[in-house]
Amino acid sequence: MRSDILIDGLPAAPDDLAHQALVNYGAYTSFRVENGAARGLDLHLARLDRAAVDLFGESPGEAEFRRLMAVAVAGRDACWLRLSLFSPEIGHRAPSYIGRPKVMTVASPPPPPLAASVRVTALTHCRPTPHLKHVATMDLTRARRAAREKGFDDALFIDAEGWVSEGTLWNVGFLRDDAVTWPQAPMLAGVTQALIAQGLDQVGVSQQTRPVRLDEVATFDGAFLCNSATPVCPVTAIDDVAFAGRPALLGRLEAAWASSPPQPI
């Protein structure tokens, strides 16, 4: 299956593609679409709308997002859809433009989950403007490279005082008995994390959100990561702290995620 790139619903022009390659300013969201629907679509669109106002001063609006998504996925039973916001009026020497951004849609084959399990290493880092899912992602790739050079799969971010926030491409949750603890810290509010949280009561799992220090992770029974491509994946180690897989509980977390039905585009 090929990838199709459209900008405002039309074939992408070379100038617009060149601008995005040269000016790293914008926001995006991405998710799996099946039969014209996606889980957490309302959350994805609300977050993208807020990012548009934050970065450009104006948003195309939900109706336009939905129109462009429908054009992008037409004729596809399943795909991975990315919506990116950018403005050719904004550049390194001309940063002041305020107005509606353009919307690039990329429909491509659905990716596999990140992994069946991961071992991660803690890295002191905080993403710039962490509440935004922005296109400045060099630091995330660099962190993953650094983790793999140390023999791990990925990196878990902590601040200078040792407080846990998020992973490179994912949110993290910690397990103790039949409860989930979400770290409280500056981070991107993940849609998959929100869907799991919404469904935990239905599967008999309690939850709390509070600050979590790296030096207390050994007191938990387990950990997991989540993002749009990987609803639930066990974290089997954080540096030298090893965790059991807890497959039964992780299955309940995935059931919590699945309890939110796909929403039509």
Regions found by a protein language model. Give the residues of each.
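Phosphate/pyrophosphate-binding loop motifs in nucleotide- or prenyl diphosphate-using proteins
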Residues: L83
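Helix-start/capping segments and mature chain N-termini
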Residues: M1-V71, F86, G91-I265
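Short secondary-structure junctions
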Residues: V73-W80
